[in-house]
Amino acid sequence: MSMQFANVWERVADTVGDEIALINGDKKSSWSSFDSKAAKIATILEEHGLKSDSKVGIYLHNSNEYLEAQYGVFKIEGVPINVNYRYKENELIYLLDNADAEAVFFQGCYADRIKAIKDQLPKIKVYIQVDDGTEPLMQGAIDYENSISSAKEQKRFNRTEENIYMLYTGGTTGMPKGVMYKHGSFIPSMLKTAFAMGFEVPEDINDLEKIVSQAKENNALTVSM
């Protein structure tokens, strides 16, 4: 099994599924729930024509939904694109077009901003709105939770660590620029951090249970926002 983010997180979910993975305020999600929602998001994206190497904009605040969406994109071997919520319309158009984005997850409070630019983004196949209680569902968008509740989980497969992980810069010296990493090089660098923290780092993903068990003992399995 290769060092690809979805492969790794699936292995964690299988090992410690009942442990808490995400906390955002009063909202908590176990590793099993995290994996299940991501698998359904993957199905939704595939049903709208996205596939390996498809780019997906994530225009969300730090939240459980952000990480679920990102995980779902990794499951289809797609490329999640970080979108700064402070960007104005011209920056959003540039970034999403430059990235060749085919889907966008967006916070409900930015529905008017997305509505104003969507006609200038012909490559986008689906808009997925996360309801935050601020705006009604944008015409032409699908609701995040409702679509997940009716979706089936994507069947698992072994993905390649040649998949790309791309981070867009902040644009302080011009428009944002995408910086690309391969999963197979990015994940080992993260494991070096775990080693520096005193964890026993596995040489192969099939030994991942070692570090997961240690993380469980040290209460280090949860992302809090």
What do these predicted ranges mean?
Residues 9-11, 46, 64-83, 92-93, ...:
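Hydrophobic alpha-helical segments in the ANL/AMP-binding
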Residues 30-31, 164-192, 197-204, 208:
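Conserved AMP-binding A3 loop
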Residues 47-48, 75-146, 158:
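Structural core segment of the AMP-binding/adenylate-forming
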Residues 1-21:
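A short N-terminal helical cap/helix-turn-helix that marks the beginning
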Residues 87-116, 189-225:
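Conserved ATP-dependent adenylate/AMP-binding module captured primarily in the ANL superfamily
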Residues 56, 73, 104, 169-172, ...:
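Conserved S/T- and glycine-rich ATP-binding loop of Class I adenylate-forming
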Residues 18-63, 70-71, 88-93:
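Conserved AMP-binding/adenylate-forming core of the ANL superfamily
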Residues 18, 150-170, 174-175, 213-222:
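Conserved pre-ATP/AMP-binding loop-to-beta segment of ANL
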